[in-house]
């Protein structure tokens, strides 16, 4: 799969909710996103970055690679930190971005199970960045 580079109109659009997470096409898309992300040495990759307007993203953190289907951040900490971020759709660009240190997120995993997770630090930042992609927000709009 090819990673779309900005500007591309799909990167500015809110994605559609996945109706059936266990659908064969959805499962294949997740597998393809994982492979593309790993080849690109990314920490995360969202479906719109590969041309699919669906609420799916894949995260690589702490030796684990997992998909989030229809993720929703249910709470943000008031405490925020600014750190440099990059994005596979913006090769070579790194910008200081302010984000919440901790979040709570709800999503469906690849097996169709609903997950509620608390994240902080780098994992929280990666999740916020990827979920932004699903909402049509690219990181340069956060600076």
For each feature predicted by the language model, list its residue ranges.
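Positively charged
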Residues: 1-143
């Amino acid at each position: 799969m090819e990673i779309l580079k900005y500007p591309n109109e799909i990167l500015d659009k809110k994605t559609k909710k996945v109706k059936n997470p266990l659908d064969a096409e959805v499962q294949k898309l997740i597998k393809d996103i994982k492979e593309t992300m790993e080849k690109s040495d990314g920490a995360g990759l969202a479906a719109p970055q590969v041309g699919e307007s669906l609420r799916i993203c894949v995260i690589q953190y702490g030796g684990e690679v997992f998909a989030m289907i229809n993720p929703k951040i249910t709470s943000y900490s008031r405490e925020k930190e600014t750190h440099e971020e990059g994005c596979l759709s913006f090769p070579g660009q790194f910008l200081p971005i302010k984000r919440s240190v901790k979040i709570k997120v709800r999503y469906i995993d690849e097996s169709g199970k609903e997950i509620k997770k608390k994240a902080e630090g780098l994992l929280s930042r990666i999740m916020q960045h990827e979920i932004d992609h699903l909402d049509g927000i690219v990181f340069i709009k956060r600076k």
